[in-house]
Amino acid sequence: MTIRVLAICCYLLCIVLFSGCAAGKVSVWREYKVYCGMSSKHGEVSEDAWQRFCDKHVSAAFPDGYTVLDATGYWRSGTDAAAKERAKVILIVAPADAREKVLSVARQYRKDFDQSVVLVSCSEAETVVVSAKDADGK
């Protein structure tokens, strides 16, 4: 009975140790999403204005990179009417201590483009960096 229990424990330990293995370095970071509405009281935010904002604020805060997605946001307005708006979503994968930099970008967007709100979400993200070396199996 003891050998059987020991064998099962070893088997389970191997599963735990090797189940997370993948090519490249694995680390746990955060995935931040900043939802930026493209409408304001003054009209639509132009692509040029958006690009200037990203160049000045987002790229400066996250020089290692970020991703921008085009989106359409839907919500209920204060009058309970359905509303939709063109939007941009900035995806940033960074260490947990980047939270204040992300919030600073969101605050700056809200200020620069007269937004009532800018939504920021954060979730844990397991990241795996796959390099050319890993892809070649070396």
Predicted features, each with a name:
Residues 43, 77, 129-130:
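Extracytoplasmic/secreted cell-surface and envelope-processing proteins
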Residues 22-69:
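N-terminal secretory signal peptides
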Residues 17-20:
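C-terminal motif of bacterial Sec signal peptides marking the signal peptidase cleavage site
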Residues 12-14:
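Classic N-terminal secretory signal peptides
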Residues 41, 72-75, 97:
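Short Gly/Pro-enriched loop/turn and capping motifs at secondary-structure junctions
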Residues 63-89:
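Short, intrinsically disordered low-complexity segments
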Residues 1-10:
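Bacterial N-terminal signal peptides that target proteins for export
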Residues 82-138:
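Helix-rich interaction surfaces within compact, conserved domain-sized segments
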